[in-house]
Amino acid sequence: MQQLEFYPIAFLILAVMLEIVANILLKMSDGFRRKWLGILSLLSVLGAFSALAQAVKGIELSVAYAMWGGFGIAATVAAGWILFNQRLNYKGWIGLILLLAGMVMIKLS
């Protein structure tokens, strides 16, 4: 297993945070009816991919991408719940649990 260094992990955390911001802004843009929020969402996605590109310099691509996607989805679910009162049904919860279990398995491999 590859030993992780601080800077790649910091860039991965930044990538996850920017992805969450992008998703929230996209929802708030109301299908790009609020253009500035839509533009900020696109800029956040660009920043997220740029941070992910830096993260994969020190973290294996499969691990970094799985962590970025998985944590991004889980945190977006939480943000949707808190900010927009969106709830998952039982199938959604099962999917989220499987996603998190898959992330753990990839990291342990």
UniProtKB/Swiss-Prot annotation:
This protein's UniProt keywords: Cell inner membrane, Cell membrane, Membrane, Transmembrane, Transmembrane helix, Transport
Membrane-traversing stretches: 6-26, 36-56, 64-84, 88-108
Pfam families, per the entry: Multi_Drug_Res
One of the protein's GO biological processes: glycine betaine transport
Chief location bin: membrane
GO CC annotations on file: plasma membrane
Compartment annotation: Cell inner membrane
PANTHER family: SMR FAMILY PROTON-DEPENDENT DRUG EFFLUX TRANSPORTER SUGE, SPERMIDINE EXPORT PROTEIN MDTI
Reported function: Catalyzes the excretion of spermidine.
Protein name: Spermidine export protein MdtI
